[in-house]
Amino acid sequence: MSKDQILEAIKGMSVLELNDLVKAIEEEFGVTAAAPVAVVAGGGAEAAAEQTEFTVNLVSGGASKINVIKVVRELTGLGLKEAKDLVDNAPKTLKEGVSKDEAEALKAKLEEAGAQVEVK
């Protein structure tokens, strides 16, 4: 199978199928799909610059956890168990390195479902 054929097969997969594929690759090769996090020590002048990347944190699942779990699954592509664990163990980071517009959209969707969310 060529690289192009593999890419075409991946393009035709749903989010759930892709999630299963990633898990299978992690298990087969003993790797993780987690993105490396770079830690940068910033100076005072850099802190004054406008922030361009934001982190969306789930503070609490609220009273309507089922709706929040559904939205978390939709936004992250996680499976039911993973989304439930994330909501049950809040506060947790939901997404990192997103634009301000995307962060606000995520926050609005989650708050509409009943979650408490903070954007940093």
Swiss-Prot record:
Keywords: Ribonucleoprotein, Ribosomal protein
Domain of life: Bacteria
InterPro entries: Ribosomal_bL12, Ribosomal_bL12_C, Ribosomal_bL12_C/ClpS-like, Ribosomal_bL12_oligo, Ribosomal_bL12_oligo_N_sf
Listed transmembrane segments: none
Gene Ontology annotations of biological process type: translation
Signal peptide boundaries: none
Cellular component aspect of the GO annotation: cytosolic large ribosomal subunit
GO function term, MF aspect, one: structural constituent of ribosome
CDD domains, per database record: Ribosomal_L7_L12 (cd00387)
Function: Forms part of the ribosomal stalk which helps the ribosome interact with GTP-bound translation factors. Is thus essential for accurate translation.
Sequence similarity: Belongs to the bacterial ribosomal protein bL12 family.
Subunit record text: Homodimer. Part of the ribosomal stalk of the 50S ribosomal subunit. Forms a multimeric L10(L12)X complex, where L10 forms an elongated spine to which 2 to 4 L12 dimers bind in a sequential fashion. Binds GTP-bound translation factors.
Name listed for the protein in its UniProt record: Large ribosomal subunit protein bL12
Organism taxonomic ancestry: Bacteria, Bacillati, Bacillota, Bacilli, Bacillales
